[in-house]
């Protein structure tokens, strides 16, 4: 069967996450229903990143085997028609080789965590960012973030229910950038542990608020103990931006 690579954007708020759940709305489930309506057969849509409940995507990638050939733009348009009214958009569809795997062929995943650093409530971006009212020292956050760059045992920063065989991951980039009230935490790596990005973000916010220093963050990493982690940032501000192959 022809295999297609899909690039997908979605608002994660209404979903239990990417992964199919029998009784809860999921991004994967909505796309598989759209694919069924498109080609008349049940198919599995495989995602590059299994985003958690409430996490958004600007450039999630998936692959799907369709029983009959489609022109790529026609497949994109059909999936978009059938996925409505869910807040999901198939940005592109591309015919790929049979051995392409959205998850296992990926060499890098890019995430951005968006914070609005102000006391005033959110009006336009509610559910899309994390509002942190206390002033953040973003220079201190960025300096501390460099402690986490490289290959480490990230046990402290992974969910206790994480099923990864090893807690070792290699973090290539972790930058903290301010533009007015907007604070972006930008990271990329080949892969991440469950809740790793949100755990790192919450701990960096403690640094920004002055509760922790860079040394405290380093000690938390070295502890290799989940209880040593700072707070886990809410899912609202997290975006899967891009997947590289």
From Swiss-Prot:
Superkingdom to which the source organism belongs: Bacteria
Catalyzed reactions per annotation: uridine(38/39/40) in tRNA = pseudouridine(38/39/40) in tRNA
GO terms for biological process, alphabetical: tRNA pseudouridine synthesis
Molecular function GO terms recorded: RNA binding; tRNA pseudouridine(38-40) synthase activity
Keyword tRNA processing applies: yes
Residues that hold substrate according to the record: 111
Active-site residues, Swiss-Prot/TrEMBL: 52
Role played: Formation of pseudouridine at positions 38, 39 and 40 in the anticodon stem and loop of transfer RNAs.
Name the record gives this protein: tRNA pseudouridine synthase A
